[in-house]
Amino acid sequence: GRITRNSIHYLIIDGVETPVHLTEFAKDSVFAYQHSYLPDYVTEKTKGLIPSEKVEQFLLSDMRVGTLPRLMDLTGNQCVVVDGENQGDFDQFASDIITAASQGKRFLFRSAASILTSLAALGKQPIPAEEMAKYTRNGKPGVVIMGSYVKKSTQQLEQLLQAPGIVGIEVDVSHLLEESETQRQELLQQILDQIYAIHNAGQTPVIYTSRQELQFDTVEIRLAFGSKVSDLLMDIVRGLPPDIGFLISKGGITSNDVLSKGLSLKTARLLGQVLAGCSMVKTASNHPLYPNLPVVLFPGNVGDAKGLATVYQRLSQPQT
C-alpha cells in the first residue's frame, strides 16, 4: 500500500515504509522523479512553475479535525498536498470537499482511487474480493494482458506463469523497431492464433511484452515506441475470443489503454476491488465485442509477488 505522512509519500514494501523516490518507480525512463516530499515533487513536475513554499499542506492533524475552513480560503488555483493513512482520513476530507463544492468552490484532483471511494461514499462492495469469480462469464477461462515491465510486475509474472491453467505468450517488442506493416500484421495474427488455441483448450493465455527495457536516445522516441507497443496490444484486445470469461490488464498505462482504446469504453460499472489497489469494472450488456465482461485494472506498482496469481485464482474458482 501507500500512505502520505507529513507530506512525504511512502510505498510500503514488505512492511517497510519506503519513501517513493527510493523505489524502482522513481527511476522510470519516462516518468522519473527525485522527491518523496510532495511540495518538492510538485515543484519538480511543474519545472519550477509552482515553488514548494507555495504548496499548501494538509497534514494528518488537519485532516482529522476538518479542513473545511482552509478549503474555503483557497484562491487562485492553489496547489494542495494531502496526507492520508487510511480510508477514514479521506472520508473526512471528502465530506469537507463536498461541503465546499456546494458553496461554489471547484477542485481538480490528481489522486489514486481512495479519494473516489470517499467522494462517492461507497460502502462495502456487494461481492467480496474472494468471491468475484461470480462475475466471470459462464465460468470460461480469461486472458491476461501485461505491458508493465518493472521489477515488481516481472516478479508477479513469474509467479503467475507457475499457476495451473496458465500459458504464457511472450511478445518480443524489439520486432516493432523496424518491422514493416505486413510483418506487424503477421506477428499480430500469430499471437491471436496462439491465444485461440490456448483458450479452446480451456486454459488462460498470458500475453506479456519482453522484459528487457529498450534504450532510446530521447524521451520522445521512447514514447513513440511505447505507442507502437500499446497499439499492438490493443489490436490483440480487440481480436480476443468473444467468449472469454474475464480480462486482467497489468500496468497503469496498459489498463488505461485497454479501457479507452482496446474496449472503447465511455462508461463502465465499477464492481469493487479484487485485490487492494486493483479495481474491477464490467462492460455494458450491449458492448459490441464483450458484453458484461469483468475487467481487472492492475497497476504496475501494486501487490506483492503473488498478487497477479491471486487475482487470476480468484476469478478462476469454479462456481457451484
Please report, for each region that a protein language model flagged, where it lies by residue:
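Solvent-exposed alpha-helices and their adjacent loops that cap or buttress functional pockets
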Residues: L71-T75, I98-Q103, A133-N138, A197-N200, ...
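Residue-level preference for the first positions of well-ordered beta-strands
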Residues: N77-V81, R106-L108, P141-V143, G202-V206, ...
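Cap/lid and interdomain-hinge subdomains that line or gate substrate/regulatory clefts
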Residues: G1-F90, P318-T320
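Acidic, glycine-rich loop-and-beta core segments that form the ion-binding/anion-interacting portion
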Residues: A100-V171
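General beta-strand structural signal in soluble alpha/beta enzymes
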Residues: I50-E56, V80-G84, F107-A112, T117, ...
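Short acidic, glycine/serine/threonine-rich loops at helix termini
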Residues: I3-I13, Q92-D96, A120-K124, Q156-L157, ...
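C-terminal structural cap/anchor segments
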Residues: L188-G252
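Active-site histidine-anchored catalytic micro-motif
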Residues: G1-S36, I244-G252, N256-A305, T310
